[in-house]
Amino acid sequence: MKTSLLAAVCLAASFSSVASGQGGQGKGGRGPAQTWWVNKTGGGVYKPPNRPLWKLAELKQMHAGQNTWQEQIILDPEQDATYNSGAPGKKYTARMHPDTPTVFVVVAGEVHFNAEGQEPATATRGAIVNLMKATVFSYEVTSDQNALWVEVNPTNYKTVYPSAGPPPAASTDGTVVKVAFNHNPAAYTPPNRFMFNTFTDAIAACKGGVVAVQDDHLFASPLLGYVNPAENKCGNGTGNIGSGPAKPDDPPFNSHSVFGHIHAGPAEWWIVQVGQISGKFENTGEFHAVEGDVLYAAPMTWHQMAAEAPSGPNVRLAMGGYQLINMQNTENPGRGRGDQ
């Protein structure tokens, strides 16, 4: 596909959640989606550390012999994300991000959080911890195994530490100085809350696709689907399985074709919270992920997601800097219609 191509795309007719944004023939009698022109640059451009797939198993191999480690997995114009492991008993001292919020997504183990203005709480597998800007917080690993989590911040965030505690180590190009200012933790406004757990608040509560985080350059929504609709006790069929598992008569996937949808500018990415998820990415290929893995669609990339685990729930936690519009392709409208 040529870069800088004026491509026709479909814009979802309503500014609904990531889980419900659809292109093409609208549901509930909405009629056809509106069509628009957008200037599309070449997709599948990944600048390190960004990559289509970060596999948890490979991260563990990279840090073999280490219990506590941190790996930068995403750094783009909107977000800065690290994958983290903490040994049992590891403590992280009080700190604050004065101008920006922070999200922790716990993959395994237990992490106990103390956040200003909130009751102390322990985050376990499936937890999404949402810390408002200007909130002093500390945390520690309380499980008897290593805890794993993804920390997500807006790009160019800064951290300060209360002067009552020890100063942090200086960067190679900086000096730690004492500053003075007053702070007030930002208030939670719906849908934001201190802690959300995908297993209890989405799967058990039949609220797949609910927006868990929507703040400045931070968005998170667990997309829940069942390949076998008989296992879905919520009674809404397969839910959000995207394009679903591959079928025997499917043609070979061509990453240089037009399929699925794009987003006009920002990247979209996903943390697999349970089940198996595949991602097809323009000019890049097809990737298969399991719980704890991270998939990333680079900006302006045609992409198509699918739930693959034949049994049980499949959840991909949709992440990004914004609540993105799904701009469906019009060249092959039957390929990836309604996937997220």
Identify the meaning behind each predicted range.
Residues M1-L6:
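Bacterial N-terminal signal peptides that target proteins for export
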Residues A7-S14:
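Bacterial N-terminal signal peptides
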Residues A19-G21:
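Boundary at the C-terminal end of the N-terminal hydrophobic targeting segment
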Residues G23-D80, T93-A94, V160-K247, P252, ...:
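A short, N-terminal "cap"/entry segment at the start of jelly-roll beta-barrel domains
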Residues S85-G86, M96-F113, S243, I262-G279:
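Short, conserved beta-strand element in jelly-roll/cupin
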Residues T93-A94, F113-N114, L131, V136-D144, ...:
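Short beta-strand His + acidic residue motifs that chelate non-heme Fe in jelly-roll/DSBH
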Residues G117-A134, N283-P299:
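Short acidic-glycine-tyrosine-enriched beta hairpin
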Residues N130, D144-Y161, Y296, S311-T330:
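A short hydrophobic beta-strand segment most commonly corresponding to one strand
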